[in-house]
Amino acid sequence: GKGGDFLYRWGNPSAYDRGSNSSQRLDSQHGVNWIKEGYPGEGNLILFNNNYGNLTSAVFEISPPLNSDSTNYIINETEPFGPNELEWMHTGDFHSNVQSGAFRLSNGNTLISVADDATIFEVDSLGSTVWNYEYPGANIMIARSQKYSIDFFGGSDSTAFPDYIIGDVNFDSSNDVFDLIYVVDMHYGFYPKTL
């Protein structure tokens, strides 16, 4: 049918003849994803709602209603897709007309990317910003970003890069000024040099 193999139409019931314009909750949403198992809110959907209000965006978390064995979404034949209420929402002084995204982190915080502003920030469950990054360049967008744990590239617990030292960007088995030079060169578009 219309929309592919999986279709969950929450947020604008007038688009499928089950509501009016006044019941619209989403406008130009992006980056819908399931919250990973083991993370706070696991199994819920989280998304970036580009046009939440006048020049305002928002991140929504919803918990779609499930049947008794928690394997299928409950979809009434005549009513709008549930839920009626948000599980969690964050909005504030950010807006993007395009792209953008949000991902729940294992500690319960949410990483938000605002494409038009080339900004990435992390908020806790109460909506307080705990980390913020604004790309300093012009004419740049950050569509979506993800945060990796400090041990992502390996260390003693990994077979991928067992001898990798966190921060050793040039792989010379040492954290030193050469790693910094390497990062600066990459940032400004110079080709990496052999040091």
Where do the protein language model's features map onto the residues?
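Alpha-helical segments with a strong preference for the paired helices of cellulosomal dockerin domains
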Residues: V169-L195
